[in-house]
């Protein structure tokens, strides 16, 4: 129970009921009165609109120029085939854009398991039917583009793609979210003598590309990250103090003596008024070889010493020398 009337009850995860691999029910309690709807509605909206995932975005079918057509030997029209392709549940690792291929011939259903893909791709629903071939000589060949995204993106919003795409490349409305259904319910909860508390029950179904528990965890993380700005609200009114980055790397401001060159090389550089490492790196090999008494052996020594410090001759330094050196 609370130690003070101003303290809020901290909810705990009471139960996770795994109805199936894609269907789960999560129960959270106790919540202060009203917080069940506050949190439940926020999580529901995020789960429906903001979960990242992979979806079919473009399809090329051999012999098909546009979606308002049909293909000989295929029972479904092209619009229905595209609609079925939207139902593919795909998981892609380490890539944001992949091309899958499908080639099938002979009578029978064409299913997701007939799609050819590499090791970075996993099709979660291999039994998903894409179309049916109705003739022994019928065949279908297609290339399916799968991209990573978030939420729902209609094909009509990708206008730049429509203008650039070749004839025969069909755009598909992309539903990236792996969440298929989400509902929440707020029930009464009790802690000791308090009976006005909430219990939040979230029921969630996904397409299998993401486990229900992980989906809720990600949604809660997104919500928490968005609310972080309000936690630091007082700091927003204060001007942000930007750390001034040094204009030049500190090593460039050090004297040439720090390179510990031989006496001959050091004296030649001083005679040319090269006092700082920043002065030296801006000189080219040709310029240094014109220096009296500085030969190829000394030049090689200078290049090796600079290279050991990640520097080289012929570098360009904007705004050199800095004010601190110019004043000396």
From Swiss-Prot:
User: Where is the region Alpha C-terminal domain (alpha-CTD)?
Assistant: 248-328
Q: Name one GO biological process term.
A: DNA-templated transcription
Which enzyme class, named as a word? transferase
State the family named in the UniProt similarity comment for this chain.
Answer: Belongs to the RNA polymerase alpha chain family.
Q: What is its EC number?
A: 2.7.7.6
Give the matching SUPFAM superfamilies: C-terminal domain of RNA polymerase alpha subunit, Insert subdomain of RNA polymerase alpha subunit, RBP11-like subunits of RNA polymerase
Q: Where is this region: Alpha N-terminal domain (alpha-NTD)?
A: 1-234
Q: Pfam families of this UniProt entry? A: RNA_pol_A_bac (PF01000), RNA_pol_A_CTD (PF03118), RNA_pol_L (PF01193)
Q: What is known of its domains?
A: The N-terminal domain is essential for RNAP assembly and basal transcription, whereas the C-terminal domain is involved in interaction with transcriptional regulators and with upstream promoter elements.
Source organism of the structure: Haemophilus influenzae (strain ATCC 51907 / DSM 11121 / KW20 / Rd)
Write out the GO cellular component annotations.
cytoplasm; DNA-directed RNA polymerase complex
Gene name per UniProt: rpoA
Its UniProt entry gives the catalysed reaction(s) as: RNA(n) + a ribonucleoside 5'-triphosphate = RNA(n+1) + diphosphate
CDD domains, alphabetized: RNAP_alpha_NTD
Under NCBIfam families, the record lists: PRK05182.1-2, PRK05182.2-5, rpoA
Listed as disulfide-bonded, the cysteine pairs are none
Quaternary structure per UniProt? Homodimer. The RNAP catalytic core consists of 2 alpha, 1 beta, 1 beta' and 1 omega subunit. When a sigma factor is associated with the core the holoenzyme is formed, which can initiate transcription.
The alphabetical list of record keywords is:
DNA-directed RNA polymerase, Nucleotidyltransferase, Transcription, Transferase
Region forming the signal peptide:
none
Q: What is the lineage of its organism?
A: Bacteria, Pseudomonadati, Pseudomonadota, Gammaproteobacteria, Pasteurellales
What function does this protein fulfil? DNA-dependent RNA polymerase catalyzes the transcription of DNA into RNA using the four ribonucleoside triphosphates as substrates.
The protein depicted here goes by the name DNA-directed RNA polymerase subunit alpha
């Amino acid at each position: 129970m609370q130690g003070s009337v101003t303290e809020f009850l901290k909810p705990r995860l009471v139960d996770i009921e795994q109805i199936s691999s894609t269907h789960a029910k999560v129960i959270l309690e106790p919540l202060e009165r009203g917080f069940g709807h506050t949190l439940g509605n926020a999580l529901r909206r995020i789960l429906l609109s903001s979960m990242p995932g992979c979806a079919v975005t473009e399809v090329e079918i051999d012999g098909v120029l546009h979606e308002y057509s049909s293909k000989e030997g295929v029972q479904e029209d092209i619009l229905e085939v595209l609609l079925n392709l939207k139902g593919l549940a795909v998981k892609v690792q380490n890539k944001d854009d992949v091309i899958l291929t499908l080639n099938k011939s002979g009578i029978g259903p064409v299913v997701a398991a007939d799609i050819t893909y590499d090791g970075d791709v996993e099709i979660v629903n291999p039994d998903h039917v894409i179309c049916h071939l109705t003739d022994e000589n019928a065949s279908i060949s297609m290339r399916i583009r799968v991209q990573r995204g978030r939420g729902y993106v209609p094909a009509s919003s990708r206008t730049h793609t429509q203008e650039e795409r070749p004839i025969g490349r069909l755009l598909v409305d992309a539903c990236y979210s792996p969440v298929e259904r989400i509902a929440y319910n707020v029930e009464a909860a009790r802690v000791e003598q308090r009976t006005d508390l909430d219990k939040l029950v979230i029921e969630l179904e996904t397409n299998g590309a993401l486990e229900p528990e992980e989906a809720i965890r990600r949604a809660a993380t997104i919500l928490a990250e968005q609310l972080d700005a309000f936690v630091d609200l007082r700091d927003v009114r204060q001007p942000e103090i930007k750390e001034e980055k040094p204009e030049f790397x500190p090593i460039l401001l050090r004297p040439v003596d720090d390179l510990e060159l031989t006496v001959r090389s050091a004296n030649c550089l001083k005679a040319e008024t090269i006092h700082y490492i920043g002065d030296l790196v801006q000189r080219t090999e040709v310029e240094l070889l014109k220096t009296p008494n500085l030969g190829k052996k000394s030049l090689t020594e200078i290049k090796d010493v600079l290279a050991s410090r990640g520097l080289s001759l012929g570098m360009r330094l904007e705004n050199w020398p800095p004010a601190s050196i110019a004043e000396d």
